[in-house]
Amino acid sequence: SGPLKCVYFDLEHTLNEEWARMLGVNLEENFYLVSPDAQSAEELLDLIVDMVSSEEVGLVVLDSICYLEPMAELNESLEKKSYGGISKLLSSFFRKVTPYLHKFTASLLIINQLRDSMDLYKLYDTPGGRALKHACSVRIMFKKGELYNEKFEAIKKSSELAFGNQVLVKIEKSKISKPDRIVGFYKLSYYSGIEKESELADFMLKFGLITQAGSWFTFIDPESGEILDGFKAQGMPKVVELLKNNPELFNLYTTYINNNMIK
């Protein structure tokens, strides 16, 4: 049977392959990029159903939902177009594709966007209607956080020397974990992608796996609670550097936190 394929529907025609590789995406093996030109929403959604039901595709990414255009709107001029007709179509699509997703343990990842809400009680809403929200097993909101420099220090939003930014993450809906909670954040470097070691250092500090005295950080053995000899750093950048240069240390704390702290 072999490895399952990943199919990425780039409806916005904005996928940056260099940036994708930096984030760890392997574009050379079992990755298929689809950049449709004038296909209707009906054609694209039927294609997704066919792909998932083929048992050869393990992940489909749809980027993004608001660029789907029903056939009736595709053939009309801009003057005659009436928007909002995608919700009913999505309802039918999810009834078709969901059984195949479960049967073949495939995943459908749909990227959406925030829109200003007309509802006085809601600051924002997302395109796709209720059918999309109801069908999803998990809905996650990503939001840009504060900027930081190469020392992982917060800087002003007006700064032109940003090294990266925090990405805030919130679970909007989940059938597999607790909903409506702030999961936390991770750091995104504009030069190297997701800063896994910096994220781990933040978790270690939060859970007491490193202790701070002034500018010095001491590593704690997660099993014994004793000071870990030979690992001490001055400043958070040095902590991150230690984790990058010592894979066994990175794996030790990552495994412990995933198994014992994250619930």
Language-model features: where?
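Phosphate-binding/switch region of NTP-binding enzymes
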Residues: 51, 83-207
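Short linear loop/turn motifs
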Residues: 32-41, 213-223
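Short hydrophobic alpha-helical runs that function as membrane-insertion/retention elements
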Residues: 5-8, 32-34, 109, 140-142, ...
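Short Asp/Glu-rich motifs
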Residues: 18-19, 120-121, 223
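Terminal-proximal interaction/regulatory segments of ATP-powered molecular machines
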Residues: 215-263
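N-terminal cationic and glycine-rich segments that engage phosphates or anionic surfaces
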Residues: 73, 116-120, 213-216, 227-228
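PDZ/PDZ-like groove recognition
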Residues: 203-213, 217
